[in-house]
Regions:
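Cap/insert and terminal regions of metallo-dependent hydrolase folds
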Residues: 2-23, 215, 224, 232-334
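Short, solvent-exposed mixed-charge patches
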Residues: 247, 341-342
């Protein structure tokens, strides 16, 4: 037995030595293989069934934590690729997930808090740099056009440098900027996208004083996915989510944050305490989401924009305690999770 262990150990040492020697003396050959592997990996297309809706939670965090990417959700239907909200880190995470940003068709913004749109200029630019050769339609409530007009000036020099370097045939500035599809909702909800059997309805939510704020209902092939946006418990969300196959809803653990406020006050961190106190009145606790989702007959519930994020066993248990009574499948989403609506 000892002889066998010595033999295995010696073999491992030999393999490690030879590997390090090869790396040291033949880095060019290895770099070619590595480059080839990376390109082939990045060229692999996502496996999307045209009868299904495929959803990725790119970012599931909130401004209160840095361990997760901020809000961002990718939706694939047939040959269409949409992203809903583009918070900090969404673009980088999307590339890590190998999502084909060069094929992006449209972006939908729920409201203008930075954790939902701060990466929008980067997404517009990055998808173009990666080869997007079609318009990128941006949908959002009032205020969107001003943001995109400012983004034109923000990216103008960057885009000029790209064209000067690579030429206009490679870097066609026709597609370098997002196309504004700003909308105003007159009667609580409005169909803003209706093409190729895909219908997307924007609807008002209650995130006061942040107005306008909206959620989105996505319908295709008798399937429905609803994204709540940021909101306190809102009956319209669950009206839109009635019989939904998938509801993606923000969540906040108010019970934990109330204690956090007291701790911050005791430490004389008054500014932080004030902010943590204020955010509790325009988000939704998990137990309220579960109650209303059960009434709406939601099949699968996914909680994201988790405040705080359940990245340790204690916080995770606090969430689980509040969602245990949901009648269907329920998930505390993580960055990079995938959900398929069949």
């Amino acid at each position: 037995m000892k002889s066998l262990i010595k033999y295995i150990f010696s073999l491992l040492v030999f393999v490690i030595f030879m590997s390090l020697s090869f790396i040291n003396f033949y880095p060019e050959k290895l770099s070619k293989s590595l480059t080839n592997f990376t390109i082939e990996r990045n060229q692999k297309s996502l496996s999307i069934n045209e009868d299904e809706i495929t959803v990725f939670t790119i970012g599931t965090g909130s401004p209160l934590n840095t361990s997760r990417v901020q809000s961002g959700t990718a939706v694939f239907i047939k040959d269409k690729f949409f992203i809903f909200d583009v918070g900090d880190g969404v673009v980088t995470k999307a590339e890590e997930m190998n999502l084909p940003l060069n094929e992006l068709d449209a972006v939908f913004i729920t409201h203008f808090h930075s954790d939902h749109y701060i990466d929008l200029p980067y997404l517009i630019n990055r998808s173009w740099v990666l080869g997007r050769n079609k318009d990128l339609n941006i949908y959002g409530p009032e205020g969107l056009k001003n943001i995109l007009d400012s983004n034109y000036d923000f990216l103008k020099l960057e885009n000029k440098h790209r064209v000067d370097h690579h030429g206009s045939e490679i870097m066609n500035t026709k597609y370098a900027y997002g196309v504004s599809n700003e909308f105003k909702i007159e009667d609580n909800k409005k169909i803003i996208y209706d093409s190729d059997e895909i219908k997307i309805t924007a609807f008002n939510v209650d995130h006061y004083p942040v107005e306008p704020s909206v959620g989105y209902a996505i319908e295709y092939n008798n399937k429905k996915v609803v994204i709540s946006g940021d909101t306190k418990a809102n009956e319209l969300v669950f009206e839109m989510a009635t019989n939904a196959d998938l509801l993606i809803h923000e969540a906040i653990l108010n019970s934990l944050l109330k204690n956090t406020v007291k701790i911050l006050e005791n430490k004389e961190m008054h500014r932080n305490s004030h902010i943590v106190h204020d955010i509790q009145d325009y988000h939704t606790p998990p137990n309220e989401i579960v109650k209303l989702a059960n009434i709406a007959n939601v099949k699968t519930l996914v909680l994201h924009h988790l405040t705080p994020s359940p990245d340790n066993i204690i916080i995770n248990k606090l969430y689980e305690k509040q969602i245990k009574d949901f009648n269907g499948k329920v998930y505390l989403a993580k960055d990079g999770d995938k959900f398929i609506v069949k």
